[in-house]
């Protein structure tokens, strides 16, 4: 009851400061569809499907990757491109990446990554206070009903039953139903540790416990990003595609349907855009 009353008071304050629609968006950045389901009718529109690792605002490398993906293809729109999250942040052209996905939603979709969430939070803070860190000043150019709403609606998972695959940014806890997975785990986890009660819990640290993907036993094959330190990961039931393009390494993608199924495509980073050894605030 107290929480409900507090939420009501907070909503009332924001409705005074902002329009009711803006207040709703600021207070609720959970997407309308948390777990997006690609039905067979949608999938049958495409001849190929490829899943792309973390782009992190590296627009030029992303375009080079698309050139390789589309090479020799009569109709690039027949290839569904799915990003494993972290479209933006850290790289030099986050707005360009964001707008590309916004303009090509018929054949380019993405799950939400932790850095997408960080920028959602930063934008909300900017709208509320007018304050923004210099490194995030590009967010000032975004629109509430356009860019922000697109980010806000990024789902946490994309599931393709026809292919028995699921895309998530960070990972899933084994033996926990999809509906009971914690939102923060799906965008931040890397490993699994056992607590004192022999219950497995998620951790974002990869120096304790074991990589969650190494113990994942299905039923879906999971494609994920987030874990650039481990680079390309290929396990029986999970494939990690974050190969650290923003850190000067590669941008990697894998075909999961069509004549090139199983093939990896990658491009080298044009330079190191972010030093992984230099600690920065989110």
Regions picked out by a protein language model, each given a short descriptive name:
Residues 56-60, 89-92, 115-120, 174-175, ...:
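Active-site environment of divalent metal-dependent phosphoester hydrolases
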Residues 43-50, 159-166, 235:
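Beta-strand-turn-beta hairpins that frame and shape the catalytic cleft
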Residues 2, 6-30, 44, 186-282:
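Acidic, His/Gly-rich catalytic cores of divalent-metal-dependent hydrolytic chemistry
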Residues 48, 78-80, 107, 237, ...:
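Residues at the starts of beta-strands that form the adenosine-phosphate
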Residues 63-64, 95-96, 123-124, 179-180, ...:
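Short amphipathic alpha-helical segments
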Residues 52-53, 81-85, 110-114, 168, ...:
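Active-site neighborhood of phospho(di)ester-bond hydrolases with catalytic His/Asp-centered motifs
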Residues 76-78, 90-200:
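Active-site neighborhood of divalent metal-dependent phosphoester bond hydrolases
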Residues 2-98:
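N-terminal active-site segment of His-dependent metallophosphoesterases
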């Amino acid at each position: 009851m107290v929480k409900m009353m507090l939420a009501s008071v907070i909503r009332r304050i924001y409705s005074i400061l902002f329009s009711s629609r803006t207040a709703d968006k600021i207070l609720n950045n959970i997407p309308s569809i948390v777990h997006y389901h690609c039905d067979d009718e949608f999938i049958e529109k495409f001849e190929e499907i490829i899943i792309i690792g973390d782009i992190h605002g590296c627009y030029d490398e992303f375009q080079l990757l698309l050139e390789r993906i589309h090479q020799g293809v009569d109709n690039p729109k027949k290839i569904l491109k799915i990003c494993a999250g972290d479209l933006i942040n850290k790289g030099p052209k986050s707005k360009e990446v964001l707008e590309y996905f916004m303009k090509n939603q018929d054949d380019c979709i993405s799950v939400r990554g932790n850095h997408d969430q960080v920028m959602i939070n930063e934008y909300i803070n900017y709208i509320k206070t007018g304050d923004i860190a210099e490194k995030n000043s590009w967010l000032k150019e975004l629109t509430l009903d356009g860019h922000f709403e697109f980010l806000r609606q990024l789902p946490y998972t994309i599931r393709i039953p026809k292919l028995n695959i699921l895309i998530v940014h960070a990972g899933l806890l084994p033996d926990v139903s999809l509906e009971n997975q914690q939102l923060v785990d799906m965008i931040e986890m890397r490993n699994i540790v056992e607590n004192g009660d022999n219950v497995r819990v998620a951790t974002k640290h990869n120096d304790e416990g074991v990589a969650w993907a190494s113990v994942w036993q299905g039923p879906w094959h999971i494609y994920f990003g987030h874990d650039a330190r481990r680079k390309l990961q290929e396990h029986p039931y999970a494939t990690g595609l974050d190969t650290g393009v923003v850190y000067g390494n590669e941008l990697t993608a894998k075909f999961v349907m069509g004549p090139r199924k199983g093939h990896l495509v990658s491009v080298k980073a044009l330079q190191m855009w972010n030093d992984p050894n230099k600690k920065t605030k989110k």
